[in-house]
Amino acid sequence: MIRGALAAWRRRVRRPRRAAAPRALILLYHRIGEPGVDPWGLTVTPARLAQHLDALRRSRRVVPLHELLERLRRGEGRLAAVTFDDGYSDALTQAAPRLADAGVPATVFVTTGALDRPAEHWWDTLAHLVFAGALPATCDLELAGRPFRMSLEAGASGDHAEATDGPWRAWEPPPGPREALYRALYDLLLPLRELERRRALDALHAWAGVAQAIRASHRLLTAAELRDLARRDHIEIGAHTVTHPWLAAQSVADQAAEIAGSRQAIERVIERPVTAFAYPYGRTEHYTRQTVRLVRRAGFALACANVPGPVDAGTDPFQLPRLQVQNWGVEEFAARLLNLT
């Protein structure tokens, strides 16, 4: 019996197997700078980015995002594409030079609502407000038309800027009152429309006694900077809505305006067609089938999500998976790529 089983196993091993379909991966970066307070792990240092790009180009052929699916259909393998979300100004000052040095093309997805004024994304503003400096012992406010009350207990005093510059991330259970406050406020603000969110943040700044200021480290691209970035040979610009809303929580009309409006705004600035889109936040709960239809209707050729997974020739071009890269050392970075494909 044992000999028969061994012989059968040998026959299976020797039997020619159909070659696996070529697969690729798409990397997703956000900020390039020093992490500081970074509850969502969005920041990769410039040095780490350079290491990642070097490791990536040594192991795969990095191609422009818009070429990826067609190359897979032709049977090309070991491909990768690089993307950056949210339109941080460091895409121009930090990422672009390192991409050029490595000879790596990339797509930068830009939110357009702040192209004409200095601005930060709301989650960065919230983290700075919650973790930098002393706070009142109780947060007791009306936010977005509903009462919000939370006690900070012993966590109200002192500077907690290091609380999230370490093991805690916002998807983990909060270890203290500041982290709990941040997550509760984040969840409250996430589904709001932009005007409601601004009013809520104004109320929170007044409660905390924190002056509203746009930090150079978190500032978004201006129109002039976007135009400069788009001139780089290795950079493609994609759309990422106007105000970075949770699209699934918005009306169909508001979704359509956010999707098409961002494309139109970018095209006015860079004077060339925009064919790629990325869903804000990008998990499956953040957009719907209707959202995908609206993206198609707006004239885009592809759209990216924020769900890890490989890409093959049969992948839906309007739900392309991406691996969100964190500030990993080069060995962990390489291991993550290997595990994905």
Could you tell me what each predicted segment is?
Residues 27, 32-33, 100-285, 320:
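Metal-dependent polysaccharide deacetylase catalytic core of the NodB/CE4 family, i.e.
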Residues 50-53, 96, 201, 223-227, ...:
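Short amphipathic alpha-helical segments and helix-helix/interface helices
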Residues 86-93, 98:
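Short acidic, Gly/Ser-rich segments with clustered Asp/Glu that frequently serve as metal-coordination loops
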